[in-house]
């Protein structure tokens, strides 16, 4: 059984990470949450909450899923950034551009070809992370037939 940490530090992270939590538990693996400076909006249906760094280290996740561009680098497991928005180019060339590489992630999960291409180019340039086009966890379920 693999273990996955769902790292949330913005309120919108709940909607992005819950579909991943569902997929993790449906395949028989274990998930847990860590909330950083946001209100606890977890429900009974959600995986357990780890409230300390020590608890995260004891949980020892294989991977940490993160919808934002920051995660503590001392958390165990590979760091996976999960994309959730469109790149509309509004911050191109700035420190906050869509494809900014901060050196924190081992894998970038992109939602579509445009973003994937940008990150594949950066992966080739920097050489310390991989890119996988995985879809959009928040919207993909809405597009599935019932």
Where are these regions (language model features)?
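Nucleotide donor/acceptor-binding cores
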Residues: 1-3
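Active-site and donor-binding regions of nucleotide-sugar-utilizing enzymes
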Residues: 5-145
């Amino acid at each position: 059984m693999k273990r996955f940490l769902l790292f949330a530090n913005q309120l919108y992270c709940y909607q992005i990470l819950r579909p991943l939590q569902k997929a993790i538990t449906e395949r028989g693996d274990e998930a847990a949450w860590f909330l950083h400076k946001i209100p606890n909006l977890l429900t009974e249906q959600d995986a357990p909450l780890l409230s300390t760094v020590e608890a995260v280290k004891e949980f020892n996740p294989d991977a940490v899923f993160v919808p934002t561009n920051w995660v503590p680098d001392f958390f165990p497991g590979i760091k996976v950034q999960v994309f959730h928005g469109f790149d509309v180019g509004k911050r191109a060339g700035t420190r906050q551009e869509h494809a900014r590489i901060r050196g924190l992630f081992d894998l970038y999960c992109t939602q579509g070809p445009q973003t994937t291409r940008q990150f594949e180019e950066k992966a080739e340039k920097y050489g310390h992370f991989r890119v996988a086009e995985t879809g959009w966890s928040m919207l993909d379920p809405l597009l599935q037939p019932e």
